[in-house]
Amino acid sequence: MRIIGLTGSIASGKSTVSAMLREPGAAVIDADAIVHHLQLPGTPVFESIVREFGPGVVRPDGSLDRQALGRIVFADPGRRRALEAIVHPAVRAEIWRQVEQYRREGRPAVVLDVPLLYESGWDRQVDEVWVVWVDAETQKARLIARSGLSPEEAEARIAAQMSLDEKARRADRIIDNRGSLDRTRAQVEAAWRAACGGEGGEPAAGSSAHHGAGSVDPGAGPCDGPGAAPEAERRGGDR
C-alpha cells in the first residue's frame, strides 16, 4: 500500500486538496479530524490539556475552547510544544490504527492529511510528500478573510509554523493553490496519476516549473490494485 503525506500550512487550501483527492478514490486519513475527536470532553487528551492549560480553555458547555487554547499556544512556543507533547502521541497511534485498517482492507493507497507533517516527523514515514502551496500574501489575506483575525494575529499564526516555502523545498510534489479551483483540481489529478505510475503531475521540489498541468483522468496504475509495501517501510522509515 502506497502512503502519501499531504501537508500545507494554515490557509493554504490543504483541506480543499484533501477533498479533491477523495474523488479518484483515495483513502484519506485526516489528522485534524482525529485531533478534534481526541479532544472531546472526557477523553484522556482533553483531561491532560485542561490540567496543563487550566480551566480557561474550557467553554461553559464543557467543551474545549480551541480559540482560547490557540491564543495561548500561538503566542508562546514553549506552550505550543507542551500541547504537542500531549496531542501528537495520541494522534500518531490513531493514524497508524487507521493505516493498518486500510491495509487489511486491501486499499492500494492512503493519504495522510497532516498539517504539521514535517514538524512531527511524518515525512519519514511516507512514500512521498505533497505540499499545498500559496505565496505569503495570499496566505495572509485568506487567513484574515476566513477567521477575522487582525493582520498582526494572522502574521503570528503563520510565523508559528514552518514556512510554506521551506515545506515546498522539501516536498516531492507541489500543488500551487493560488489560482482557480479548476486549476488546483487539474494539478491534484495529474499528481495522483503520477503517484500511481502514470504521466503528469507537479514537478518534484527543486524543479523550475511549478505550474498546473492539464486535467488528467486518474487512469490505471498501481493505485488501482493492491500494491507493494510502502517504500518508507522498506527503507526502515528513513527517507
UniProtKB/Swiss-Prot annotation:
| Single GO MF descriptor | dephospho-CoA kinase activity
Pathway given for this chain reads: Cofactor biosynthesis; coenzyme A biosynthesis; CoA from (R)-pantothenate: step 5/5
Q: From the Swiss-Prot or TrEMBL record, state where the protein is found.
A: Cytoplasm
Q: What are the GO cellular component annotations?
A: cytoplasm
Which residues are involved in binding ATP? 11-16
An example Gene Ontology biological process: coenzyme A biosynthetic process
Signal peptide limits: none
Chain intervals for the UniProt region annotation (Disordered): 197-239
SUPFAM superfamilies of this UniProt entry? P-loop containing nucleoside triphosphate hydrolases (SSF52540)
Q: Which reaction does it catalyse?
A: 3'-dephospho-CoA + ATP = ADP + CoA + H(+)
Biased region (Low complexity) positions are: 204-230
Q: What does this protein do?
A: Catalyzes the phosphorylation of the 3'-hydroxyl group of dephosphocoenzyme A to form coenzyme A.
Q: What is this protein called?
A: Dephospho-CoA kinase
Q: Please give the organism.
A: Symbiobacterium thermophilum (strain DSM 24528 / JCM 14929 / IAM 14863 / T)
Point out the gene that encodes the protein: coaE
